[in-house]
Amino acid sequence: GKVWDWIKKTAKDVLNSDVAKQLKNKALNAAKNFVAEKIGATPSEAGQMPFDEFMDILHYY
């Protein structure tokens, strides 16, 4: 719904901010590992997924 779209848009903006870039790698690695585990892929495969698909998996699990 609209709320989820807003969260994704905001997440994109936040992830692109300078402050976030310092923290992003740790968070992204944790998210990649999580997504990879859920879909049975390797973290590097999970990292190559489109952002929206990646966020959908985080959302639905």
From Swiss-Prot:
Record organism: Opistophthalmus carinatus (African yellow leg scorpion)
GO biological process, alphabetically ordered: defense response to bacterium; defense response to fungus; hemolysis in another organism; monoatomic ion transport
Keywords for the protein's UniProt record, in alphabetical order: Antibiotic, Antimicrobial, Cytolysis, Fungicide, Hemolysis, Ion transport, Membrane, Secreted, Target cell membrane, Target membrane, Transmembrane, Transport
GO cellular component labels: extracellular region; membrane; other organism cell membrane
InterPro entries membership: Antimicrobial_7 (IPR012526)
Locations listed in the record: Secreted; Target cell membrane
Domain of life per record: Eukaryota
Function text: At high concentrations, acts as a pore former in cellular membranes and causes the leakage of the cells. At submicromolar concentrations, degranulates granulocytes and has a weak hemolytic activity against human erythrocytes. Also strongly inhibits the production of superoxide anions. Has a strong antibacterial activity against Gram-negative bacteria but is less active against Gram-positive bacteria. Also has antifungal activity.
Propeptide residues according to the Swiss-Prot or TrEMBL record: 45-61
Tissue specificity annotation: Expressed by the venom gland.
Family membership noted in the UniProt record: Belongs to the non-disulfide-bridged peptide (NDBP) superfamily. Long chain multifunctional peptide (group 2) family.
Pfam families attached to this UniProt entry: Antimicrobial_7
Protein name: Opistoporin-4
Primary location class: secreted
